[in-house]
Amino acid sequence: MKLEHPDRLMNRTPLSLAALEVHDAFAERHIGPDAADQHAMLEALGFASRAALIDAVIPKTIRRTETLPLGPFTQPKSEAEALAALRELADKNQVFRSYIGQGYYNAHTPTVILRNVLENPAWYTAYTPYQPEISQGRLEALLNFQQMIVDLTGLAISNASLLDEATAAAEAMTLLQRVGKPKSNVFFVADDVLPQTIEVVRTRATPVGIEVKVGPASEAANANAFGVLLQYPGVNGDVRDYRALTEAIHAAGGHVVVAADLLALTVLTPPGEWGADVAVGNTQRFGVPVGFGGPHAAYLAVRDEFKRQMPGRLVGVTVDAQGNPALRLALQTREQHIRREKATSNVCTAQALLAIMASMYAVYHGPHGLKTIALRVNRIAALLAEGAKQLGYTLANETFFDTLTFDTGARTQALLDAATAKRINLRRVSATQVGLSIDETTTRHDLADLLAVFAQAAFTNDVPQVDALDAKLAASNTASVPAALERTSAYLTHHVFNRHHSETEMLRYLRSLSDKDLALDRSMIPLGSCTMKLNATSEMLPVTWPEFGQIHPFAPAEQTVGYREMIDQLEEMLVAATGYAAVSLQPNAGSQGEYAGLLIIHAYHASRGEAHRNVCLIPASAHGTNPASAQMAGMQVVVVACDAQGNVDIEDLKKKAGQHADKLAAIMITYPSTHGVFEQNVREICEIVHAHGGQVYVDGANMNAMVGLTAPGQFGGDVSHLNLHKTFCIPHGGGGPGVGPVAVGAHLAQFLPNQISSGYERAPNGIGAVSGAPYGSASILPISWMYIAMMGAKNLTAATETAILNANYVAKKLAPHYPVLYSGPGGLVAHECILDLRPIKETSGITVDDVAKRLADYGFHAPTMSFPVPGTLMVEPTESESKEELDRFIEAMIAIREEIRAVEDGRSDREDNPLKHAPHTAAVVIANDWKHAYARETAAYPLPTLIAKKYWPPVGRADNVYGDRNLFCSCVPIADYE
């Protein structure tokens, strides 16, 4: 609804209240071009209306004819109305004091980090740092994360985060399979590993032929296993000395991975010092809200010889063109976007934002602060253990860091009931045992309450007093950690962890890092296949509400009513958008959604007695996660050719489907295609695969071009994953978090993922858990709920149409300068377009990399480089960018083309030109010694508009080859920056 100007309204009969109430104002803030701008853009394209454009772009055979069936969310809510509605749901949650533990702990987020990282768009709207020159701030923060992990685990090298502890353990298993015993397929898991980790490891193991054996750790050396997983400390609290066991496992030819509690490692001997080959774990308790299970940043650290087998992102140190230190993503040839089905993992999005928060928690507290927190946690646990013993309880684990398990016998239910009455959650271990874990937030008052609960269940009013217990422990000098396992080595000695402890210094450090980066708060990020749209403030606000942030994933169901209602509503919203029958929100990244979808397809075939179907057809243009996920799901990848127009080659598809008809499991297609086109024959593709016994997996990476206009579940898809961090407004966070829901047809709903260990069993024949928590990254789901609630059906469709309009406008304006490689009928594209720079390289020597780096001088993040076609740029402007910003990008691209023409016609040197030396730092431009044939002004201010709005890249072009040849993935000395 658009209101007329108030001055004009004053001269008329007053409008009714209903006419003055604005419910869809948010849509006007989310969608960039206003009506006048859209009219001008449509006119440039030769269309009278947006509807006419959409009719020309999307095949009529797949058009959605009905309005999105969003039920109570069909009509948009205002920002205030949506927040109020979500607040009603949040208030149905009950925030108890949680001592459940089991890998999830309450933690204090330092407010300086809360406000200046988690709530700061300079951090949360950034993209994965593939363009290092404009990503130095978050790369430094992630390097700090790696240094923190290396120091605390005692291992040589760490990655820059994984999705959660459970999936990190699964990644470690497959890593050890690649490097381990060639004749063994056994992976041994100690029975005191976190239950959710065991479940995810089993899910991952089955498709690739790994046998998981679970038993007492003492049996590991004789299991003939290629790898062994140990928990340190164990789930029930035991702190065990595994030195001798590790030596025995190594002697038997196996390797050891240790799931280690990061806070405990500040006081316990790190795994790397007692022989572990790999360490994994969760960094959640380093200042990240528990959030009903996520998102949190996991870690994985290895011995040096395993570094090239690591999954996930790895930040390394290199030099720039001037020889100064620079950071970049290292060893990318391990990853899915290059290695495809041979990659070390299918991980694309990880948990960068949460890793940055955890690293800044370590920077803020420093080694002394962290150890103080750990010692306080341990002390409170020891005081509770002593008090419970005085009340007649038996402690099942005499050694502990923060977790206690009590033999409670007949008192079990009474103890749990007494705790519930005080709004306290304990962990029911069994009918005769109760466990609990102390955390950073536990206070003296909380300890007194816990002692009172234990006393009540023991039917006594004689509650042990905290001060008396403290004095007794001090006098006895008893230790809960074996002396042999007390940490003696130093950690976090680098200056970054020892100089930013005042809030002033911390604030300025965070600001200095964010100033180095280009994020959506500065300019558009036109990355194809990434959908870098607005992450609105109203969508983000609920993430930090305690009613969402302070709920344990294994809390009793009666305490999570609001969460589950919100999740149910969001699932129904996504069902409406996709045209499928059911959705699971458990996968905590798009890669995990893909993987879950393929496991569901396998389970479906197996239920029909066709478990032998294992061939997955994948078009040559597919995203790298597709073949990597297929390999992880135990499938054989068969590539289907694309024709000259970039579409799936129908004849080759028929041939491959026929050749593999007896074993065909699925095809994975992306729609619109990764070439940015709505393929006209998508229904035929689906029919061919179905006719040969396969299922159709439609990758939802490009769902932003479909919402409200077409639906994969209606044109032949059987299963899809979505990217809520693309289409539905969860921010990219500099490389995560993400959410990758899996959506399925009615015949596949019974196979959606469960999590038996936590009692989450939604599907009768569900696959095993694919994430550590039942609902994955639950605490960021309100972002997508808010987006859909504020947009409503009509405006969601309008957003899709505008995304297509913006892409076609950019393509039209740039086509005279850069050929648009693929298009549909009428020369139109979907929501993105591919600019072909290969002819430019032939005529000028200028590469796609040169253009990408030069864009930084113009204040823009480069589009997606060399995907899906080498030597191209893929541009996706999204619906959120205004015509003004689109024109600014178009102007920059045309100006760069003129710079290239100057090289082509000899006005500029082929080597000494502003593209070859881009990006230009301020230090380079103001240096006394300027040796280039072009002017300083050309380097720094190629357009007059940049004078008022200039972004300076902090480093020159990063040397990728040097960085990989001289791999260094820890914090560099401060002298290197001086």
Swiss-Prot record:
Its EC number is 1.4.4.2. GO terms for molecular function: glycine binding; glycine dehydrogenase (decarboxylating) activity; pyridoxal phosphate binding. Keywords: Oxidoreductase, Pyridoxal phosphate. InterPro entries: GcvP, GDC-P_C, GDC-P_N, GDC_P, PyrdxlP-dep_Trfase, PyrdxlP-dep_Trfase_major, PyrdxlP-dep_Trfase_small. GO terms for biological process: glycine decarboxylation via glycine cleavage system. GO terms for cellular component: cytosol; glycine cleavage complex. CDD domains: GDC-P. Coiled coil: none annotated. The modification N6-(pyridoxal phosphate)lysine is found at K726. The keyword Hydrolase does not apply. It is an enzyme of class 1 (oxidoreductase). Its cofactor is pyridoxal 5'-phosphate. It catalyses: N(6)-[(R)-lipoyl]-L-lysyl-[glycine-cleavage complex H protein] + glycine + H(+) = N(6)-[(R)-S(8)-aminomethyldihydrolipoyl]-L-lysyl-[glycine-cleavage complex H protein] + CO2. PANTHER family: GLYCINE DEHYDROGENASE (DECARBOXYLATING), MITOCHONDRIAL, GLYCINE DEHYDROGENASE, DECARBOXYLATING. The glycine cleavage system catalyzes the degradation of glycine. The P protein binds the alpha-amino group of glycine through its pyridoxal phosphate cofactor; CO(2) is released and the remaining methylamine moiety is then transferred to the lipoamide cofactor of the H protein. Belongs to the GcvP family. The glycine cleavage system is composed of four proteins: P, T, L and H. This is Glycine dehydrogenase (decarboxylating). The lineage of its organism: Bacteria, Pseudomonadati, Pseudomonadota, Betaproteobacteria, Burkholderiales. The gene is gcvP.
